[in-house]
Amino acid sequence: MATSEEPSTDASIICYAPSMITTNGVWQGDNPLDFSLPLFVLQLTLVVVVTRFFVFILKPFRQPRVISEILGGIVLGPSVLGRSTKFAHTIFPQRSVMVLETMANVGLLYFLFLVGVEMDIMVVRKTGKRALTIAIGGMVLPFLIGAAFSFSMHRSEDHLGQGTYILFLGVALSVTAFPVLARILAELKLINTEIGRISMSAALVNDMFAWILLALAIALAESDKTSFASLWVMISSAVFIAVCVFVVRPGIAWIIRKTPEGENFSEFHICLILTGVMISGFITDAIGTHSVFGAFVFGLVIPNGPLGLTLIEKLEDFVSGLLLPLFFAISGLKTNIAAIQGPATWLTLFLVIFLACAGKVIGTVIVAFFHGMPVREGITLGLLLNTKGLVEMIVLNVGKDQKVLDDETFATMVLVALVMTGVITPIVTILYKPVKKSVSYKRRTIQQTKPDSELRVLVCVHTPRNVPTIINLLEASHPTKRSPICIYVLHLVELTGRASAMLIVHNTRKSGRPALNRTQAQSDHIINAFENYEQHAAFVAVQPLTAISPYSTMHEDVCSLAEDKRVSFIIIPFHKQQTVDGGMESTNPAYRLVNQNLLENSPCSVGILVDRGLNGATRLNSNTVSLQVAVLFFGGPDDREALAYAWRMAQHPGITLTVLRFIHDEDEADTASTRATNDSDLKIPKMDHRKQRQLDDDYINLFRAENAEYESIVYIEKLVSNGEETVAAVRSMDSSHDLFIVGRGEGMSSPLTAGLTDWSECPELGAIGDLLASSDFAATVSVLVVQQYVGSWAQEDDMDFPESPVHSHETKVTYGLENPR
């Protein structure tokens, strides 16, 4: 037990009871908090809960998770809750700090190992002169400012020299946190911009310099007894790095070669590597460098590829979500804001924040100016490089442990890191607004696209499972020399707190290097599939892209890209997939949110693809494509857009198209679509329904006239009285087709679909689309639900209908009129 529960000083003596680890239980009269294990479990739970609370509170402000973790530590420490003596002595007694700090450092050890695994040294080598000079320019001035302030903050009675103090403050102020910066860039949707790429590359270079300076600072701090100790520390560190590069790396490469491709690595090899992390930490700690340095270097020598991916997947969530917050909690327990006393000290704090931030901005602006960048972009770049995070906290904690930094300086620098990182997102949001070019183009629908012009399609993909059906659908879209297809493939990646998801920005696929993480591996698989399609198909151009966003705002990236690229049609997968027994199950409910938001905000037409086996019906070779396609036409702009797309597909020699138009058999007035009852909830303008009926008739007549000679195109009119007869008619043809193309029918109400919406599970598909996609539908038929761009409706009145596409084969059209009664 502890003989002293006062705040730690050099004279404190803490006594431990080694056998008091687990309790006999409260029924035996034991207090669980007197024993190490239950106390640690309570502390860990409290740290995670408080940290997650701040993550939830700060999420609307788009703050990185490191802010929440530092705030959680400060709240639990002597600055807030720790001011209560009872709380401090009960929850965080000094006798428990050793266990807590040991576990925190174990978590830190493995986290830095993962950072090393994910970091690609080749990217640093290929950053270019601009990123390198920007990184150096952004480090020099803050380092000099830290050195200048060290003279006023360093106490003459401290046992360590001024040089060591300068080094610690300089490193703390000049570093940039690469993982935190990646998160901020993704939140601000700058990660794929030029300024995002430059700042990420500069941050990587900065990170490498920071590790070198950190090793030097630790060596100087831990070797004050003899002047040659620092030299031996540096030599030993160099030898350790050489052993890792020339001995450990080849050994791990041998393990990778011995493991057959596609098979899992053995448990023995994984445990061997995880043990190697601890051994590396022990060695570097023993030679006078911090243990995290050894873990980081050990991670760097792990070859990129499946082994690195396996290690990341096994460790990252546990280490980042559970153990790493302990490190920030320890930092918070060491942070006593009350130690910052007097107006002069607070003035120094604000001066350090302002001048350090200004120094990095000025240094970056000067270098950026010489590279021809606008001043506003240089300022934004400088602000982004002010991001602080884990490396700075390591520097500060080492400085505190080595008595280089006193309580006042430590608390000051923690607040500096907190404020400098916290203000970046709002300031950059206000200051830097990328110039959005006003894009004005008329061909926002397939119906408006001329048959002799390029069709631009944006394909959204969540997982590789979406790829085969989409590729087959695109091949069926019949790209020709006269009307080629330009495909923008957008891999949609959720923005998470995991660093590995961020590193996809530095995709090294083109250099032939393997994927760094599962996200990049999936992206590579998707892109390779589409590029393979491009190579084997004629008149197709593919451009792969990646969007990293929260699902709540992912549609903004899709809409922005569609407008920038002047896209006419967006294809996005349905949120449900087919199961083995033929049913439909949801893969990720967030996909549905993306689809709904996209339908509401899209700048062009949208198609939601329900995949129920289309991938088994076609091949990449256009000569072997064979599809039976059906269009169910009820009327309205969405149905006309569906027919326009099917019309294009019908020109493919392997496509047979059936157009089934449903007509009410009582009164022509009833066939006109009427407004839905909830007018206020609909986004579409009030339409002249007779005009819409006229547009339907005109387009159908044009379609029939242009295709009268082609027997692969069948047109049928079916008279029905109500929704029940409509369902019966649809079910009668479900087994003879591979793909249904239907309009969503947004804002339209018809007696032909009366009652169908009452049982609708997915309103975003419309009444007919929901029926076809439901698990109750007998056949495994894929469905494409089309919504025409809203703004095109007003233009249709004055629009000439497009010429019919050029046909390459002579066939004959079949007409029919059916009454089911």
From Swiss-Prot:
It is a multi-pass membrane protein. Residues 800-821 are annotated as: Disordered. The chain crosses the membrane at residues 37-57, 65-82, 97-117, 131-151, 166-186, 200-220, 228-248, 268-288, 292-312, 318-338, 350-370, 378-398, 410-430. Pfam families: CHX17_2nd, CHX17_C, Na_H_Exchanger. GO terms for cellular component: membrane. One of its GO terms (molecular function) is antiporter activity. InterPro entries: Cation/H_exchanger_TM, CPA2_transporter, Na+/solute_symporter_sf. Specifically expressed in pollen. Keywords: Antiport, Ion transport, Membrane, Potassium, Potassium transport, Transmembrane, Transmembrane helix, Transport. May operate as a cation/H(+) antiporter. Belongs to the monovalent cation:proton antiporter 2 (CPA2) transporter (TC 2.A.37) family. CHX (TC 2.A.37.4) subfamily. This is Cation/H(+) antiporter 15.
